[in-house]
Amino acid sequence: MEAGGVADSFLSSACVLFTLGMFSTGLSDLRHMQRTRSVDNIQFLPFLTTDVNNLGWLSYGVLKGDGTLIIVNTVGAVLQTLYILAYLHYSPQKHAVLLQTATLLAVLLLGYGYFWLLVPDLETRLQQLGLFCSVFTISMYLSPLADLAKIIQTKSTQRLSFSLTIATLLSSTSWSIYGFRLKDPYITVPNLPGILTGFIRLVLFYKYPPEQDTKYRLLQT
């Protein structure tokens, strides 16, 4: 195998490993729901939006014939669906959860109808679907910025997950390089905000470490 082939194979494996590691951080929430038989302060929307994101990128991977995208987003969609079902089972507000799920499901079905029925040209469909997935991914990476501002204000990293931060940073970096190797801006560009927010989170962990965070909360009580 040539050096370029080895590098591509290694990069593909890194994308799969780091991204599945990022998705599996939700297993701690799943165990918490099973142990406490409640959802406590666990947020539902990230599970739902990540599932939609996985399904979108899965479709893009199928159209592009990219095995790495297909594997990662198939497993990701299965995991997120599992988290959604567990949340629905333990949530006391089942009506609100079902309403949010049905709304995004309807949007997803409309999107599939548009891309597969109204855009017959394969290349145009691939470009438009890639653009949609890119914009959706960027919005997901940028959505926690308000929480980051609150962390700076309170000097507390309590609401941040260090393992998720590392997994997101590694995943975003590997996908950006992967997209660059494929000359696919729809893969490269949306992962750049993930690298940026990942570095910001690491800086916050360095500036407000868990030990200092605990002392700060004790002083506030």
Swiss-Prot record:
Broad class of the protein's primary localization: Golgi
Domain of life: Eukaryota
GO biological process: carbohydrate transport
Residue ranges of the region described as Mediates interaction with TRPV2: 149-221
MtN3/slv domain segment(s): 10-94, 127-212
Membrane topology: Multi-pass membrane protein
Subcellular location, record wording: Golgi apparatus membrane; Cell membrane
Parts of the chain that traverse the membrane: 3-23, 44-63, 68-88, 102-122, 129-149, 160-180, 186-206
GO molecular function: glucoside transmembrane transporter activity; sugar transmembrane transporter activity
Classification via InterPro entries: SWEET, SWEET_rpt
Coiled coil regions, renumbered to chain: none
Alphabetized UniProt keyword annotations: Cell membrane, Golgi apparatus, Membrane, Repeat, Sugar transport, Transmembrane, Transmembrane helix, Transport
GO terms for cellular component: endomembrane system; Golgi apparatus; Golgi membrane; membrane; plasma membrane
Annotated family: Belongs to the SWEET sugar transporter family.
Function: Mediates sugar transport across membranes. May stimulate V(D)J recombination by the activation of RAG1.
Complexes and interactors: Interacts with TRPV2; the interaction probably occurs intracellularly and depends on TRPV2 N-glycosylation.
Name used for this protein in its record: Sugar transporter SWEET1
